[in-house]
Amino acid sequence: MLSPATPDDLDDLAAFLRSADLTVAALAEPAVHLWLDRDDAGAVCTTTGFELGSSGEHALVRSVAVRPDLRGTGDGLRLARFALDRAADAGARQAWLFSRRSGGFWQKLGFTATTTDDLAAALPDAHQVRLFRSTGQLDREVAWHRPLPVRADSGARLAAG
Protein backbone atom coordinates (compact mmCIF):
# COMPACT_ATOMS: atom_id res chain seq x y z
CA MET A 1 0.00 0.00 0.00
CA LEU A 2 1.39 3.40 -0.95
CA SER A 3 2.22 5.77 1.86
CA PRO A 4 3.64 9.28 1.80
CA ALA A 5 7.43 9.33 1.95
CA THR A 6 8.80 10.66 5.22
CA PRO A 7 12.24 12.08 6.00
CA ASP A 8 13.16 8.63 7.37
CA ASP A 9 12.42 7.11 3.94
CA LEU A 10 14.64 9.43 1.91
CA ASP A 11 17.87 7.40 1.93
CA ASP A 12 16.08 4.19 0.88
CA LEU A 13 13.99 6.13 -1.64
CA ALA A 14 17.07 7.74 -3.20
CA ALA A 15 18.85 4.37 -3.45
CA PHE A 16 15.79 2.82 -5.12
CA LEU A 17 15.45 5.69 -7.61
CA ARG A 18 19.18 5.52 -8.44
CA SER A 19 18.80 1.80 -9.15
CA ALA A 20 15.98 2.71 -11.59
CA ASP A 21 18.20 5.40 -13.19
CA LEU A 22 15.85 8.19 -12.05
CA THR A 23 16.69 11.64 -10.73
CA VAL A 24 17.11 11.97 -6.98
CA ALA A 25 17.42 15.77 -6.85
CA ALA A 26 15.34 17.66 -4.29
CA LEU A 27 13.46 14.68 -2.83
CA ALA A 28 12.98 16.51 0.48
CA GLU A 29 11.74 19.80 -0.99
CA PRO A 30 8.23 20.92 0.04
CA ALA A 31 6.97 21.10 -3.57
CA VAL A 32 7.97 17.47 -4.17
CA HIS A 33 5.30 14.95 -3.14
CA LEU A 34 6.40 11.31 -3.06
CA TRP A 35 4.83 8.01 -2.10
CA LEU A 36 6.34 4.58 -1.75
CA ASP A 37 5.52 0.99 -0.97
CA ARG A 38 7.73 -1.46 0.89
CA ASP A 39 7.69 -5.22 0.70
CA ASP A 40 7.40 -7.52 3.73
CA ALA A 41 11.16 -7.27 4.30
CA GLY A 42 10.96 -3.47 4.37
CA ALA A 43 12.62 -2.86 1.00
CA VAL A 44 11.20 -0.15 -1.26
CA CYS A 45 9.43 -1.86 -4.17
CA THR A 46 7.45 0.97 -5.84
CA THR A 47 7.52 4.76 -5.85
CA THR A 48 5.57 7.57 -7.44
CA GLY A 49 5.21 11.32 -7.12
CA PHE A 50 5.17 14.77 -8.60
CA GLU A 51 6.54 18.25 -8.08
CA LEU A 52 3.97 21.03 -8.04
CA GLY A 53 5.08 24.13 -9.91
CA SER A 54 5.12 27.51 -8.19
CA SER A 55 1.94 28.59 -10.02
CA GLY A 56 0.10 25.52 -8.73
CA GLU A 57 -1.26 24.84 -12.22
CA HIS A 58 1.52 22.60 -13.52
CA ALA A 59 2.92 19.39 -12.07
CA LEU A 60 6.05 17.49 -13.04
CA VAL A 61 5.40 13.76 -12.66
CA ARG A 62 8.49 12.06 -11.30
CA SER A 63 9.84 9.03 -9.51
CA VAL A 64 7.38 6.51 -10.98
CA ALA A 65 9.31 3.25 -10.54
CA VAL A 66 8.62 -0.44 -10.03
CA ARG A 67 11.17 -2.97 -8.82
CA PRO A 68 12.17 -5.21 -11.77
CA ASP A 69 10.67 -8.40 -10.33
CA LEU A 70 7.27 -6.69 -10.06
CA ARG A 71 7.14 -5.29 -13.60
CA GLY A 72 4.34 -6.50 -15.84
CA THR A 73 1.83 -6.55 -12.98
CA GLY A 74 0.10 -3.27 -13.81
CA ASP A 75 1.82 -1.48 -10.93
CA GLY A 76 3.37 1.11 -13.25
CA LEU A 77 -0.02 2.23 -14.56
CA ARG A 78 -1.44 2.23 -11.04
CA LEU A 79 1.44 4.36 -9.78
CA ALA A 80 1.26 6.80 -12.67
CA ARG A 81 -2.50 7.22 -12.27
CA PHE A 82 -2.03 7.74 -8.54
CA ALA A 83 0.48 10.56 -9.17
CA LEU A 84 -1.79 12.16 -11.78
CA ASP A 85 -4.79 11.97 -9.44
CA ARG A 86 -2.83 13.48 -6.53
CA ALA A 87 -1.51 16.27 -8.77
CA ALA A 88 -5.08 17.07 -9.89
CA ASP A 89 -6.20 16.94 -6.26
CA ALA A 90 -3.50 19.52 -5.47
CA GLY A 91 -4.93 21.85 -8.10
CA ALA A 92 -2.66 21.13 -11.07
CA ARG A 93 -4.32 21.48 -14.46
CA GLN A 94 -1.41 20.25 -16.60
CA ALA A 95 0.94 17.30 -16.10
CA TRP A 96 4.43 17.18 -17.58
CA LEU A 97 7.29 14.70 -17.41
CA PHE A 98 10.65 13.74 -18.83
CA SER A 99 11.06 10.26 -20.28
CA ARG A 100 13.56 9.14 -22.89
CA ARG A 101 12.75 5.42 -22.64
CA SER A 102 9.06 5.03 -21.75
CA GLY A 103 7.13 7.14 -24.24
CA GLY A 104 4.78 4.31 -25.19
CA PHE A 105 3.87 3.77 -21.55
CA TRP A 106 3.05 7.45 -21.03
CA GLN A 107 1.07 7.62 -24.26
CA LYS A 108 -1.27 4.95 -22.80
CA LEU A 109 -2.07 7.54 -20.13
CA GLY A 110 -2.86 10.30 -22.61
CA PHE A 111 0.52 12.03 -22.75
CA THR A 112 1.75 13.51 -26.01
CA ALA A 113 5.29 14.50 -26.92
CA THR A 114 6.12 18.15 -26.43
CA THR A 115 9.28 20.23 -26.40
CA THR A 116 11.59 20.55 -23.45
CA ASP A 117 11.30 24.31 -23.97
CA ASP A 118 7.53 24.12 -23.37
CA LEU A 119 8.03 22.00 -20.26
CA ALA A 120 10.71 24.33 -18.92
CA ALA A 121 8.50 27.38 -19.59
CA ALA A 122 5.62 25.79 -17.66
CA LEU A 123 7.82 24.66 -14.76
CA PRO A 124 10.84 27.00 -14.69
CA ASP A 125 11.41 26.55 -10.96
CA ALA A 126 11.07 22.76 -10.89
CA HIS A 127 14.19 21.25 -9.39
CA GLN A 128 14.58 18.72 -12.19
CA VAL A 129 14.29 21.45 -14.83
CA ARG A 130 16.90 23.57 -13.06
CA LEU A 131 19.21 20.56 -12.67
CA PHE A 132 18.87 19.56 -16.32
CA ARG A 133 19.52 23.15 -17.44
CA SER A 134 22.61 23.49 -15.27
CA THR A 135 24.10 20.18 -16.46
CA GLY A 136 23.21 20.61 -20.14
CA GLN A 137 20.95 17.56 -19.99
CA LEU A 138 17.73 19.45 -20.84
CA ASP A 139 18.40 19.37 -24.59
CA ARG A 140 18.91 15.58 -24.46
CA GLU A 141 15.61 14.88 -22.71
CA VAL A 142 12.23 13.97 -24.18
CA ALA A 143 9.27 15.86 -22.72
CA TRP A 144 5.63 14.76 -22.42
CA HIS A 145 2.44 16.61 -21.53
CA ARG A 146 -1.25 16.05 -20.86
CA PRO A 147 -4.08 18.05 -19.32
CA LEU A 148 -5.50 16.99 -15.97
CA PRO A 149 -9.16 16.94 -14.98
CA VAL A 150 -10.38 19.90 -12.98
CA ARG A 151 -11.33 18.78 -9.48
CA ALA A 152 -13.94 20.64 -7.47
CA ASP A 153 -12.06 19.88 -4.25
CA SER A 154 -8.52 20.48 -5.53
CA GLY A 155 -5.97 20.73 -2.76
CA ALA A 156 -8.19 19.14 -0.13
CA ARG A 157 -7.05 15.54 -0.62
CA LEU A 158 -3.32 15.94 -1.18
CA ALA A 159 -2.40 15.49 2.47
CA ALA A 160 -4.60 12.40 2.73
CA GLY A 161 -2.38 10.62 0.16
Q: Residue locations for each model-derived region?
A:
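Conserved beta-strand in the GNAT
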Residues: 36, 42-53, 57-65
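Conserved acetyl-CoA-binding loop-helix of GNAT-fold acetyltransferases
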Residues: 66, 72-85, 89, 97
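Accessory recognition modules or surfaces
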Residues: 73-79, 124-138, 143-145
